[in-house]
Design a protein with these regions (language model features):
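Soluble metallo-hydrolase cores and metallopeptidase-like ectodomains found primarily
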Residues: 1-48, 61-64, 68-69
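Short amphipathic alpha-helical face segments that pack within enzyme cores
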Residues: 53-61, 90, 94
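Short glycine-rich loop/turn motifs
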Residues: 17-21, 53, 107
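Metal-dependent peptidase/peptidase-like ectodomains
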Residues: 1, 29, 44, 82-177
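A fold-wide structural signal in alpha/beta-hydrolase
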Residues: 59, 76-78, 168
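Beta-strand segments within the central parallel beta-sheet cores of soluble alpha/beta enzyme folds
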Residues: 34-37, 74-83, 108-110
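Short helix-loop-beta-strand segments that form the rim/entrance of peptidase-like active sites
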Residues: 65-90
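Alpha-helix N-cap/helix-initiation motif
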Residues: 45-55, 151
Length: 178
């Protein structure tokens, strides 16, 4: 038999949160930036491993793999783990607003907030002119069932914070369960 006691004092007050940012400087166009992002936070008693521990680990692993491979990206690759996504896209909204003057230099924002469900393709986020680009980009993974390109929007995650500033942003489509 185990007995215990926990005393908590809860309150509602502002807290400071941070985004975690790393980058690999581009070799030809270092002022042009491609952001690969995910969010660090989760809900208490929630499924933090899938939402969004998996996305955060993919971002970190992508940075590690690029560095270890010796690849030299032409554009700067910025890897961002956003805070406060579950509370209303707070970290990405603050980052996008702070960097609004640099929005024209941000070429794309790709966010991984997919959990463990299989990636099936990409929603164009109103950028139907990019359909062929995404068809070509996803062609190498078509055999995995991950190459569907569709008109439409994908909401509820950090790429949305950049769209009002004219920055193309996407989050992959996926199956609901892994």
């Amino acid at each position: 038999k185990v007995a215990g006691r926990v005393d908590n004092t809860l309150g509602k007050k502002p807290v400071t949160q941070w985004n975690t940012i790393g980058e690999i400087k581009g070799t030809e166009w270092p002022d042009q930036v491609v952001i690969l992002g995910a969010h660090l936070d989760s809900w208490d008693l929630g499924t933090g491993t899938t939402d969004n521990g998996t996305g955060s680990m993919v971002v970190l692993e992508a940075a590690r793999a690029i560095m270890q491979s010796g690849l030299k990206p032409k554009r700067t690759m910025r890897f961002i783990l956003f805070s406060g996504e579950e509370e209303g896209l707070l970290g990405s909204a603050a980052y996008a607003a702070k960097h609004a003057g640099e929005a024209a230099k941000i070429q794309a924002v790709l966010v991984l907030d997919n959990g463990t469900g299989m990636i099936t393709g990409m929603a164009l986020q109103g950028r139907n002119q990019d359909a062929q680009l995404w068809t070509d980009l996803l062609a190498p993974v078509a055999f995995l069932g991950a190459a569907k390109v569709r008109e439409g929007n994908k909401g509820g995650t950090d790429h949305l914070s950049f769209i009002p500033y004219g920055v193309p942003g996407w989050n992959y489509d996926q199956e609901s369960r892994g």
